[in-house]
Amino acid sequence: MAAQLARVRWGTVFAAAQKGPRVSCRRWAGASADNVYDVVVSGGGLVGAAMACALGHDIHFCDKKILLLEAGPKKVLEKLPETYSNRVSSISPGSATLLSSFGAWDHICNMRCRAFRRMQVWDACSEALIMFDKDNLDDMGYIVENDVIMHALTKQLEAVSDQVTVLYKSKAVSYTWPYPFSMADSSPWVHITLGDGRTLQTKLLIGADGHNSGVRQAAGIRNVSWNYDQSAVVATLHLSEATENNVAWQRFLPSGPIALLPLSDTLSSLVWSTSHEHAAELVSMEEEEFVDAINSAFWSDVNHTDFIDSAGSMLQSAVAFLKPTRVSARQLPPSVARVDAKSRVLFPLGLGHAAEYVRPRLALIGDAAHRVHPLAGQGVNMGFGDISSLLHHLSTAAFNGKDLGSMSHLTSYETDRQRHNTALLAATDLLKRLYSTRATLVVLLRTWGLQATNAVSPLKEQIMAFASK
């Protein structure tokens, strides 16, 4: 995994980008200042919109022109619906800090989000578990509907409309990259052609257009990727009774992880990763059968064996003898009573990682640069982490009067984020594979590993600190 994700350096400037009809390097005849931007962000999803917001609210970008291209229409949430959306994100404290920096987090808190203060992860094939919490019961993270985040970002984009222009229902169809060396009759910027024929120029193009990124493909950047033989089923669930509901639950089943994320005292969001065939069955089940399947997945011990349970108990006793301190006790998740109508959907899962995040006048962020399995709950947080890093380097460059598209600071962003993202992708992929088998030796090793990790508080704190970024 790590070897496949290793960074492949670029040999010749945009040599690969000259393949295919969508990309060209041609001479430039000149352009109006009206269509020249300092930064163009391609893709107006959560990460792209947040990137444009962050730039628009940065003091060193007050005299810059920023453009956000979004292929879809403007999403307006005039009134918060009573029913919760089935598409939610787990927001880390680090991501909440980023959203707070430009005012979006206040909007989110004034609408609705749910903090969780503990997270319990356990194995369906043994009694092994790990409990993440904080001694002072600080928030570990927040479960927020994607529509709520998008509404908050839209509000903050409107607040900086003087700096940030948003073109909805607009999509780039081709790019012209600048020559690697300055030429008197060529443009030094990236040239973008939109679907309606309009042309734009930018000193820096930021690709935030998802895991099938057109920007990445047009630039000829290699993407290491594969599809897992899994789909994720998501749904909005009603609990059997009202609870404090501040724990995020995740259980590793042989077919894939199932997670229950708190939305309110009586509601939780389901993310169940399983085989394509089983996922299709879950979506088509009658409601009562579906609810029974969820409760069984969280409560049943059908995959346990006496040998594994005995071996796990021996290690647990040894740990308790050597370290007679408080050990996290296994808690029982809440039972599910029913599911919101029409909230069940599925989507395929996979992994992806761009060999390069940057080229001259180009940076990739979010899913355009990396795609991760949802078991870690880090997808959007990785994208927001990209924003924090890129914003830092671009803000410093703007303050010093540097060229925003220069590799001198773009490379620093790439180094920073590839180091973090590659480690997280590799760890997530390893966990997915480690928990996808019932082989006795593997189950025993992962049982002992989980128990040992749960007993070492400093190690758990390091894991939480890494995931909180």
Curated annotation (Swiss-Prot):
SUPFAM superfamilies: FAD/NAD(P)-binding domain (SSF51905)
Location of the transit peptide in the chain: 1-28
Gene Ontology molecular function: any one: oxidoreductase activity
Compartments where found: Mitochondrion inner membrane; Golgi apparatus; Cell projection
Gene3D superfamilies: FAD/NAD(P)-binding domain
GO BP annotations listed: ubiquinone biosynthetic process
Pathway: Cofactor biosynthesis; ubiquinone biosynthesis
Catalytically driven reaction(s): 4-hydroxy-3-(all-trans-decaprenyl)benzoate + 2 reduced [2Fe-2S]-[ferredoxin] + O2 + 2 H(+) = 3,4-dihydroxy-5-(all-trans-decaprenyl)benzoate + 2 oxidized [2Fe-2S]-[ferredoxin] + H2O; 2-methoxy-6-(all-trans-decaprenyl)phenol + 2 reduced [2Fe-2S]-[ferredoxin] + O2 + 2 H(+) = 2-methoxy-6-(all-trans-decaprenyl)benzene-1,4-diol + 2 oxidized [2Fe-2S]-[ferredoxin] + H2O
InterPro entries (alphabetical): FAD-bd, FAD/NAD-bd_sf, Ubi_Hdrlase_CS, UbiH/COQ6, UbiH/COQ6_monooxygenase, UbQ_mOase_COQ6
Essential cofactor(s): FAD
UniProtKB keywords: Cell projection, FAD, Flavoprotein, Golgi apparatus, Membrane, Mitochondrion, Mitochondrion inner membrane, Monooxygenase, Oxidoreductase, Transit peptide, Ubiquinone biosynthesis
Membrane-protein topology: Peripheral membrane protein
Entry EC number(s): 1.14.15.45, 1.14.15.46
Similarity comment text for this entry: Belongs to the UbiH/COQ6 family.
Assembly, per entry: Component of a multi-subunit COQ enzyme complex, composed of at least COQ3, COQ4, COQ5, COQ6, COQ7 and COQ9. Interacts with COQ8B and COQ7.
Protein name: Ubiquinone biosynthesis monooxygenase COQ6, mitochondrial
Species of origin: Bos taurus (Bovine)
